[in-house]
């Protein structure tokens, strides 16, 4: 917030002040943080001028938040990349939004289905975003069938002789 021109007074709770509209900024993040990227997008959406975040997080839920902001009138480019560009608008409007499924939750249910040796189908709207996670599960011997709106896991197909994670 301070980089955008807000003044933060360390009280409890924090007192955040600004004289006028926040100013667009170019920011280089030390690492790709979901929270930092989402906060940047929300602030930059109504900041004056343009803002750029380098090393932005690009997870599906970050993209979903940016899509919601777009539906409210925000001008955001670079979704799914490490460079997020936002041109601030004077005001955002209301919108209707459906929050996508959480990939951690979907993966947890798939893991439960896998370790119990059964067959479990998870209905989800994020199947296309689960590819990397499914690849890792397949290394452990799990098998999957996917459709546009579901993932079915079939339990263990091989014995695990040692932990998957190697010593660092």
What would you call each of these model-derived segments?
Residues 1-168:
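Structural preference for solvent-exposed beta-strand-turn elements
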